Design a protein with these regions (language model features):
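Gly/Ser/Thr-rich helix-start
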Residues: 48, 77, 81-85, 99, ...
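Acceptor/aglycone-binding surface of glycosyltransferases and processive sugar-polymer synthases
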Residues: 69-73, 77-87, 101-184, 200-219
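Conserved amphipathic alpha-helical interaction elements at protein-protein interfaces in regulatory
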Residues: 15, 29, 33, 58, ...
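Structured catalytic core of nucleotide-sugar glycosyltransferases
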Residues: 1-132
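Short conserved micro-motifs on helix faces and helix-strand junctions that flank
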Residues: 12, 71-73, 161, 234, ...
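Hydrophobic helical membrane-anchoring modules
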Residues: 1-4, 180-313
Length: 313
């Protein structure tokens, strides 16, 4: 049995006022059963427009373990997690969503697995309490990102994980603005493993990850960890050149030896339109990479903090 740890639980929150009370109650019971400490809950309010912040402030007056990090506006889920990591002081840090779908009771299992010498133990989702369409979208999303990424990414592993202090410090040291924390968590290395965890239904409300947010997260995962789109553009260009040379050779052979010229004006126009579309598509991909480089050169902070509340004050 390893020495007792001081645990920090990082929770990004956006408009979760109804889910907060039962979630904090569950976490209170879970942390109370874990030896060591003092443990803390780092709740990051990502510019909520409902009473999430007021609910947190009321809870902090009753529970000094609750740390509130209030961001100046909505910076996004990944930025909110980074804010939590920056303010977490524990030697082990748990990252979990604030909607209750990551069951707090699974923290015991993550901690037990971590004691076998792992720096990262992530939850692999074996079931989801969502509609068939959303489950299919997530299944496809994980496999597309894992296939295109040059960093091996575990399938069906979300942000719910326990991280050692050296992993947290390594992630905090990465300078990029477009964060895909599931990828960064893998990229930093160190011993890692996953355990199966059933993802339960939301405590209340609807998911803040709509189709647009999911696409944006997928783009961050692909463009931050892969040059495959650029290489695909180059390979397609080589293939198009090879086909054009073959067609030119065939045309020359037909003219010299059979006094005939290939016909098919419609096919020619279709080929031109198709290749023009392909060029514009890959020009957009190149533009996405260039735009991300431009965003990085501005060196703006990933988030801005409005205020921090520790110990109820």
């Amino acid at each position: 049995m390893s020495a007792p740890h001081r645990l920090s639980v990082v929770i990004p929150l956006y408009n979760e006022q109804q889910a907060l009370p039962p979630l904090l109650e569950e976490l209170d019971a879970v942390l109370g059963a874990i030896p060591g400490g003092p443990h803390e809950i780092v709740a990051v309010d990502d510019g909520s427009t409902d009473a999430t912040l007021a609910t947190l402030e009321a809870a902090a007056r009753r529970d000094p373990r609750l740390v509130i990090v209030s961001l100046s506006r909505n910076f996004g889920h990944q930025a909110a997690i980074c804010a939590g990591l920056d303010h977490a002081t524990g030697d082990l840090v748990v990252v979990m969503d604030g909607d209750g779908q990551d069951p707090p009771g699974a923290i015991h299992r993550l901690l037990a697995a971590q004691e076998h010498g792992y720096d990262v133990v992530y939850a692999q989702r074996v079931a989801r309490k969502e509609g068939a369409l959303r489950r299919a979208a997530y299944w496809l999303y994980y496999r597309i990102v894992a296939t295109l990424s040059e960093t091996p990414l575990p399938l069906d592993a979300g942000d719910f994980a326990i991280l050692s202090r050296r992993v947290v410090d390594a992630i905090r040291a990465t300078p990029e603005r477009h964060r895909y924390l599931r990828g960064l968590r893998t990229w930093v290395g160190f011993p890692q493993t996953g355990i199966p965890v059933e993802r339960v239904a939301r405590l209340s409300g609807t998911s803040k990850y709509d189709a647009r947010a999911l696409f944006r997260l997928a783009f961050d995962g692909i463009f931050a960890f892969s040059l495959v789109p650029l290489r695909a553009a180059a390979l397609l260009g080589v293939a198009a050149m090879a086909l054009s040379f073959l067609f030119a050779g065939y045309s020359l052979w037909a003219k010299l030896f059979h006094d005939a010229s290939p016909r098919g004006f419609t096919a020619l126009i279709m080929a031109i339109v198709f290749l023009s579309g392909v060029q514009l598509f890959f020009l957009g991909i190149i533009g996405e990479y260039v735009g991300r480089v431009y965003e990085e050169t501005k060196a703006r902070p990933l988030y801005l903090v409005s205020r921090v509340v520790r110990g109820g004050q």
